[in-house]
UniProtKB/Swiss-Prot annotation:
SUPFAM superfamilies membership: Nucleotidylyl transferase
Motif ('HIGH' region): 82-90
UniProt feature coiled coil, ranges: none
InterPro entries referenced in this protein's UniProt entry, alphabetically: aa-tRNA-synth_I_CS (IPR001412), aa-tRNA-synth_Ic (IPR002305), Rossmann-like_a/b/a_fold (IPR014729), Trp-tRNA-ligase (IPR002306), Tryptophan-tRNA-ligase_arc (IPR020653)
The entry's keywords: Aminoacyl-tRNA synthetase, ATP-binding, Cytoplasm, Ligase, Nucleotide-binding, Protein biosynthesis
This protein's record includes keyword Electron transport: no
GO CC annotations on file: cytoplasm
Principal localisation: cytoplasm
Protein name: Tryptophan--tRNA ligase
PANTHER family recorded: TRYPTOPHAN--TRNA LIGASE, CYTOPLASMIC, TRYPTOPHANYL-TRNA SYNTHETASE
Gene Ontology terms for molecular function: ATP binding; tryptophan-tRNA ligase activity
PROSITE patterns attached to this UniProt entry: AA_TRNA_LIGASE_I
Motif ('KMSKS' region): 253-257
Classification lineage: Archaea, Methanobacteriati, Methanobacteriota, Thermococci, Thermococcales
Length: 385
């Protein structure tokens, strides 16, 4: 792909140069001007995801803000592929999505792609992905979305999505899909069709769709933008996040398939302490003496990166910690202890909300205001084929 890293919808390798990725994908930087406009329209302080440039790139976010300002509105769409338990890296974009829903007061559609994960993961049965769909939905509900403005749907249940995907699939030839996703003669035919299903929710409303997601998912929306207007809809907009690194390295991203690299949302306090102490990469010097004399290197430290991305809300405290590390005033052990306490505190509250979500799942999927509308809604005319 680009230089020494690789980014596709299915794998991320190497230390990602996000500026080069913007150039390669043809997206635009999420500028200070756009962030200031967001704060102005929402009359709110920006969350750390925006302040610290965790979301760094976009497609047509400027048009989303213009639509909102001029009264046309927009809607949100994101999703989750249920192949296993969710970890910290999975849930962070959902918190950004929650902020957008809350501040702009818009509808949100969350697609659970149990079909995709069955097709793409040789080791998973369809029953496996349905099981993980339920477990993952509990974690998503625990984020705190508005149950009357949020529709969570599984592709295997909400079969109306298939009817919508048919005319979309007719717009995409194999050479287009191959160029974007790198399909080969060994690719399953279900994999080749699946992009049409993932694109379908961008047409749930006759407004512009905004997708908050990690940038590795951008290829799906590039395809949508090629033909959306021919169906009488808007090209979808997107804001792209960076990747949350694993505990063990700043390269690639956290992976559920490597338990030692991830903190799962169901981990116990003991699990958290053990993993951070044993596996978390730091920017410390080989000896305490060198650490005191030369200072640490927070730029190379996963512990600091996790605090920056999610676990230290206070900008002043984060800055103080950065310079205390650089000046040799902090040891790696002190930083690890601090991160452990932050993660444990977050998971304690998340797991309480997750338990309550068991009684809310019906509302998000079937009985909430937006959910009922979607189950009753007819297929839009342009998507009837």
């Amino acid at each position: 792909m680009v230089e020494d890293f690789k980014v596709t919808p299915w794998e991320v390798e190497g230390v990602v140069d996000y500026n080069k990725l913007i150039e390669h994908f043809g997206t635009s930087p999420l500028t200070e001007e756009l962030l200031e406009k967001t704060a102005e329209l929402t009359k709110s302080e920006l969350p750390l995801f925006f302040r610290r440039k965790f979301f760094f790139s976009h497609r047509d976010y400027d048009k989303v803000l213009q639509d909102y300002e001029e009264g046309r509105g927009f809607f949100l769409y994101t999703g989750r592929g249920p192949s296993g338990p969710m970890h910290i890296g999975h849930i962070i974009p959902f918190f950004a999505t929650k902020w957008l829903q809350e501040k702009f007061g818009v509808n949100l559609y969350i697609q659970i792609t149990d079909d995709e994960k069955f097709l793409f993961k040789e080791n998973l049965t369809f029953e496996d992905t349905k099981h993980w769909a339920y477990e993952n939905i509990l974690d998503i509900i625990a984020v705190g979305f508005d149950p009357d403005k949020t529709f969570i749907f599984q592709n295997s249940e909400f079969t109306k999505i298939y009817e919508m995907a048919i005319p979309i699939a007719k717009k995409i030839n194999f050479s287009m899909a191959k160029a974007v996703f790198g399909f080969t003669e060994q690719s399953k035919i279900g994999m080749i069709f699946f992009p049409a299903i993932q694109i379908a929710p961008t047409f749930f409303e006759k407004r512009r769709c905004l997708i908050p997601a990690a940038i590795d998912q951008d290829p799906y929306w590039r395809l949508q933008r090629d033909f959306a207007e021919s169906l009488g809809y808007y090209k979808t907009a997107a804001i792209h996040s960076k990747f949350v690194p694993s505990l063990t390295s700043l390269s690639g991203k956290m992976s559920a398939s490597k338990p030692e690299t991830a903190i799962y949302l169901t981990d116990s306090p003991e699990d958290v302490e053990k993993k951070v102490w044993k596996f978390a990469l730091t920017g410390g010097r080989p000896t305490l003496k060198e650490q005191r004399e030369k200072g640490g290197e927070p730029e190379k430290c996963v512990v600091f990166k996790w605090l920056e991305i999610f676990f230290e809300e206070d900008d002043k405290k984060l800055k103080e910690r950065y310079y205390a590390c650089k000046n040799g005033e902090l040891t790696c052990g002190e930083c690890k202890r601090y991160l452990i306490s932050k993660i444990q505190e977050f998971l304690k509250e998340h797991q309480k909300r997750r338990k309550k979500a068991e009684k809310q799942i019906e509302k998000f999927k079937y009985t909430g205001k937006l959910a009922q509308e979607m189950w009753d809604k007819a297929i839009p005319e342009p998507l009837k084929g």
